[in-house]
UniProtKB/Swiss-Prot annotation:
Its main location: cytoplasm. Associates with the EF-Tu.GDP complex and induces the exchange of GDP to GTP. It remains bound to the aminoacyl-tRNA.EF-Tu.GTP complex up to the GTP hydrolysis stage on the ribosome. One of its GO terms (molecular function) is translation elongation factor activity. This is Elongation factor Ts. Pfam families: EF_TS. It comes from Helicobacter pylori (strain G27). Residues 82-85 are annotated as: Involved in Mg(2+) ion dislocation from EF-Tu.
Amino acid sequence: MSGISAQLVKKLRDLTDAGMMDCKKALVEVAGDLQKAIDFLREKGLSKAAKKADRIAAEGVVALEVAPDFKSAMMVEINSETDFVAKNEGFKELVKKTLETIKAHNIHTPEELLKSQLDNKPFEEYLHSQIAVIGENILVRKIAHLKALSSHIVNGYAHSNARVGVLIGIKYNNEKNAPKVVELARNIAMHAAAMKPQVLDCKDFSLDFVKKETLALIAEIEKDNEEAKRLGKPLKNIPTFGSRIELSDEVLAHQKKAFENELKEQGKPEKIWDKIVPGKMERFIADNTLIDQRLTLLGQFYVMDDKKTIAQVVADCSKEWDDDLKITEYVRFELGEGIEKKAENFAEEVALQMK
């Protein structure tokens, strides 16, 4: 064990939570190379931190920080195994240091974070030490780091339960409107936190996704109509399309012509068609963009005014403030979204802990 200091053994123990003698043996085997010693312990199944890192982390927090000038914002999802751990002071300090590191090194991905430096050592090393100390697997799963260009602002909203966070970026032209744009961005972020839009705009959808969702939507409406018919209630229109991306100029022109032919067959004077057709087209578009209304931020109806979509709210503010506003960024994190958490019985859990 010549040349292996007590300080190095302690450092390896802190990083892996392995036994003291196992740490000494590992360091001797690899001639004092700390990283190789960590790998050695993992390969031998002696690193408790490594075992913890194999367990599923689906709890934790979503945290964000917006710069005082609203020119930058950061958001992070950090997962733990239980919500209890997410509330302890050690975990809160980890979240704080993570945000500080993201800001200091202009980090945009978890991979960049792990390779960055914190207090003159790799962040990954710091994270492993916290896994050992806190006693649960901890994973920095998602990072968003937005920076505003000139005539842009970013703002955000984090729900009080620390499970949902949203960042919104808005472009504007008139600097005097900046305070109002900041408030608008926060209100829209609050809307998105509650309503869960998947994307900013229908242009972010693939055509295959829209076609698949439209088939499911039609089946859903047909089922609802069966119940409505049984109860003697009005039936919903069955859409042909699901999203604005399917409504090409040709599709709209064809539908407009169909409405005009319908009015002609009904004997309506041609001079009044211009008063009837726009309303019919508006209803046609509404009936055939239901996916947008459900899943896009711009297409959803605003929670603070459910007669207007977010796109209409932004357009109205542009007109009222003599500006040209545009939402340019939308990021939403929800804790554990997409993680499949294992259901284990008590006996299995105890057996795992004994390994």
